[in-house]
Regions:
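Pocket-lining segment of extracytoplasmic ligand-binding domains
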Residues: 145-210
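Short, surface-exposed acidic
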Residues: 132-135, 201
């Protein structure tokens, strides 16, 4: 049985299609074994493709933008969709059934400053008809640091990927007031990536079938 190495940029229930492929026996049905890992905070899983430690990774499409902006050709290829909606939510301090995006203007909001999350948040603001620059945006660090900051009383709202917002609710810290996905609409959010040469292998074809 061939073994493939899979790496996640972030490990979250949001990537359940990929997790299910691993844990549901679909890879085994195609004669594949697997090992998986999670990239270190702040490091894209695409790095694991370049150094050979992973065969296939979960990655946002935007992680190739910086290379393209330099006029270079990305070394990896995005070949399979994981999901097609933004998986981030806004959580407030209190339940707000009458929430509107306009309430963000003038409020302190902990916003995820990762490349794609920030870009998508700005686009959601545009789609919702509000001025991003009127929001008191707080950069509290990575996802875990943001979560800690909000739990410690910083910010009126926080922008997080599921299931972190739902955990805040379960812990009595806040209430989810809206999701970004419906505001933005369908988009290429997260996908599978690999190197072109691996995609020519029988293992790659078996993985894609799974």
């Amino acid at each position: 049985m061939s073994k493939i190495n899979i790496q996640f940029t972030l490990f979250s229930a949001f990537y359940s299609p990929l997790i299910s492929v691993m844990t549901g026996g679909f890879l085994a049905e195609e004669g594949l074994d697997y090992e998986f890992s999670v990239a270190k905070p702040g490091v894209t899983a695409l790095t694991a493709l370049d150094d050979g430690s992973a065969d296939v990774v979960q990655s946002t499409l935007s992680q190739g933008f910086s290379v393209l902006n330099k006029g270079l050709t990305p070394t990896s290829v995005h070949f399979g969709q994981i999901n097609e909606m933004d998986g981030f939510f806004l959580t407030g301090r209190n339940n707000d059934p009458n929430f509107s995006w306009r309430k963000l203007e003038g409020s302190e909001v902990l916003v995820h400053h990762g490349g794609q999350p920030m870009t998508m948040f700005k686009y959601a603001c545009y789609r919702a008809g509000i001025n991003f620059h009127k929001i008191k945006v707080i950069d509290a660090g990575n996802g875990a640091e943001m979560d800690t900051a909000f739990r410690n009383g910083i910010g009126k709202y926080i922008h997080q990927q599921g299931p972190a917002p739902q955990q805040l609710e379960a812990d009595g810290i806040g209430k989810v007031v809206t999701a970004l996905g419906p505001v933005i609409g369908p988009c290429g959010f997260s996908s599978l990536a690999s190197r072109p040469e691996w995609l020519e292998t029988e293992e790659a074809r078996a993985f894609t079938r799974a």
